[in-house]
């Protein structure tokens, strides 16, 4: 059997694909090694969403190809979104790769390892619970993919072309996955998809995330469910009402907005207008006081004027988001935005990213001043550090704890905040 070292690139949705492949390989009795020097096979699961992701994949493939050329590994397999996006152009670019497999190849990874063969297929038009899964996150926190693909057509985005149409898992499959996670000691589940709040649209004819959540919160051992990748259009009053009354749903919402200026939103082909976005944020905070909001913004979208940018910067200051990710616009071939006129210069994009990050830093400083002396519930990731409801794994802040003598990773504790700087807070267990 192969000795396999795995490299998983990209987002949490990609990570769940890696977990599925490793679950299959583990079931088939392959050896999964944590030290690359012990491997005879390297499996790279790639991301291709934007240029920096493709550049990272390129570096890893070339590095692994060098190891193969030196005789340090026998096989090199490349999976995921890069294969799905660029397909048959890849073998000539990376001749030492034994097999490129797209998203449909995940289920056949055992056969690919044994008998390497390229597999270029359209994106799947279905989604089901994985037969096997090997969790790669901390034992107490896991990602659960409730849907895949996307029916939105944002002008800058390649995801629909890579991942295919939006399709939801059955509720029965999701609940079964969550129960299996509970059995393995998971305390926190982050629900993920390309468009999580649209869950069930394809099955029931309307978004049905609340219906799913009502089933999930009955699972006794899971204390936190976290909603990631929400679209403002499908963040409904019913969903907010349920979050407000159900303690197992984190008062946290990851809702990428991308911009606020009306001309830019229209050019992006976003479904919500400026007024609708502002109204939705107001509604969220009315129904769920204290809700932590995370969002993403794109700086330097084609046609973004200085006036558009200043409006976005002012919006960040006004909206007071708890967490903000800022990205320079990435020109993606095949998207409407790639051929738009008035492309913004790279130098200006970089400057605008820096200004938005600075604007958000000032917001965080004001939020932090109000945190001192407050008591928050924290899920410990290790003996000295954990996360509050406001902190998603890997991408948000953390809470450093003092006075921990009897608690372990996976325990929930109450922490009194004593200081805060940036996205990191410090407190004492009480």
Swiss-Prot record:
Per UniProt, residues of the TRAM domain are 369-430
Q: How is the cofactor bound?
A: Binds 2 [4Fe-4S] clusters. One cluster is coordinated with 3 cysteines and an exchangeable S-adenosyl-L-methionine.
Listed PROSITE patterns: MTTASE_N, MTTASE_RADICAL, RADICAL_SAM, TRAM
According to its UniProt record, which cofactors does this protein need?
Answer: [4Fe-4S] cluster
Domain MTTase N-terminal residue range list = 2-118
Places the protein is found: Cytoplasm
**Superkingdom of this entry's organism?**
Bacteria
Q: Which UniProt keywords apply?
A: 4Fe-4S, Cytoplasm, Iron, Iron-sulfur, Metal-binding, S-adenosyl-L-methionine, Transferase
Q: Which CDD domains match?
A: Radical_SAM (cd01335)
Q: Where does [4Fe-4S] cluster 2 bind?
A: 150, 154, 157
Q: What general EC class does the enzyme of this chain belong to?
A: transferase
- Annotated residues that bind [4Fe-4S] cluster 1 are located at 11, 47, 81
Q: Which GO terms describe its biological process?
A: tRNA modification
Which residue range or ranges hold the Radical SAM core domain? 136-368
Give the GO cellular component terms, alphabetically. cytosol
Q: Which reaction does it catalyse?
A: L-aspartate(89)-[ribosomal protein uS12]-hydrogen + (sulfur carrier)-SH + AH2 + 2 S-adenosyl-L-methionine = 3-methylsulfanyl-L-aspartate(89)-[ribosomal protein uS12]-hydrogen + (sulfur carrier)-H + 5'-deoxyadenosine + L-methionine + A + S-adenosyl-L-homocysteine + 2 H(+)
Family that this chain belongs to: Belongs to the methylthiotransferase family. RimO subfamily.
Q: What is the protein's known function? A: Catalyzes the methylthiolation of an aspartic acid residue of ribosomal protein uS12.
Quote the protein name from its UniProt record.
Ribosomal protein uS12 methylthiotransferase RimO
Q: Which organism is it from?
A: Elusimicrobium minutum (strain Pei191)
